[in-house]
Amino acid sequence: MSFIDEVKIHVKSGDGGAGCVSFRREKFIPLGGPDGGDGGKGGNVIVEASPNLSTLLDLRQHPHQKAGRGRNGMGKDRHGAYGADLKMLLPVGTVIKDAETDEVLVDLNEPGMSVVLLKGGRGGQGNARFASSTNKAPKFAQPGEPGEERWLRLELKLMADVGLLGMPSVGKSSLISKISAARPKIADYHFTTLKPNLGVVAYKNYKSFVMADIPGLIEGAHEGAGLGHRFLKHLERTGQLIHILDISWMPDRDPLREYEAINRELALFNPELAEKKQIIVINKIDLPVVKENLATVLPYFEERGLKVFPISAATGEGIPALLDEIARNLWGQAEEEW
């Protein structure tokens, strides 16, 4: 798949430089004392959340990352230069885990957030440090400390205000294409969307929100069926969910059973997902068969206190009312003018 949302990499901070063994050798000072300088500190590994990145593709292509080594100390009390830090710019929303223990090390959930992930090794002390009244000419120095290293797994979770949820081919891609600048691949067959698509939706009075078109889910998704649980995690950070249903296939397909099946998958993957607010959308209201079937499914949702918004992603019918509802949930109220 072209969207890289998970990658395993090896990172290493810089080794410290070695201390120097050196003695003053100057004219008229035949027995000069020790003047070996310290080694430089190794570079740190730093991770920073960048709002300008959206994938982990670069790290997939370069899975081994290493900070600079500290330079060795030199004579005349000259210390080695510090190793260059390795600054890894990552998309906002990247979660960094230890690849072996699965421990979460860093959650880069804010733009500009910067964390020192691995510290560089300390530089070794030169022999000038070890001169004493009992040993005025030490002939030894410290080696530099090795840097830290570990295998990491990076996961990128989409930072979206609204997530589009539903079985394959119910019209999620068509809706996000209609109301945002996103242009996902659209066709009338399952799993057209093979990656999460983000779209920025412009609302009234210059307000906007981010919508995520999540690939279609099927029963067993929490166990990896279909496109698998790798996409369920993209829903975890969305503030609200739009659950899109296609009732044009009744009675061959039961949209209410599909609705329950998807919510079951959410609960099995993460119980908190099933508790997120959902807006129920009936797509393709421009089709006569959908208008006929609408009366059959409405009581189901009315009994559960859920609002239903019939729309057409093809013609735009019903979309203004849907966006007003999203705005009410995001900001507490909808704007008066569309």
From Swiss-Prot:
It is found in: Cytoplasm. Disulfide bonds: none annotated. Mg(2+) binds at S173, T193. It is an enzyme of class 3 (hydrolase). GTP binds at residues 166-173, 191-195, 213-216, 283-286, 312-314. Its main location: cytoplasm. GO terms for cellular component: cytoplasm. InterPro entries: G_OBG (IPR031167), GTP-bd (IPR006073), GTP-bd_Obg/CgtA (IPR014100), GTP1-OBG_CS (IPR006074), GTP1_OBG_dom (IPR006169), GTP1_OBG_dom_sf (IPR036726), OBG_GTPase (IPR045086), P-loop_NTPase (IPR027417). Its cofactor is Mg(2+). Residues 160-331 form the OBG-type G domain. The keyword DNA-binding does not apply. Keywords: Cytoplasm, GTP-binding, Hydrolase, Magnesium, Metal-binding, Nucleotide-binding. GO terms for molecular function: GTP binding; GTPase activity; magnesium ion binding. Residues 1-159 form the Obg domain. One of its GO terms (biological process) is ribosome biogenesis. The keyword Ion transport does not apply. Its EC number is 3.6.5.-. Monomer. Belongs to the TRAFAC class OBG-HflX-like GTPase superfamily. OBG GTPase family. An essential GTPase which binds GTP, GDP and possibly (p)ppGpp with moderate affinity, with high nucleotide exchange rates and a fairly low GTP hydrolysis rate. Plays a role in control of the cell cycle, stress response, ribosome biogenesis and in those bacteria that undergo differentiation, in morphogenesis control. This is GTPase Obg. It comes from Geotalea uraniireducens (strain Rf4).
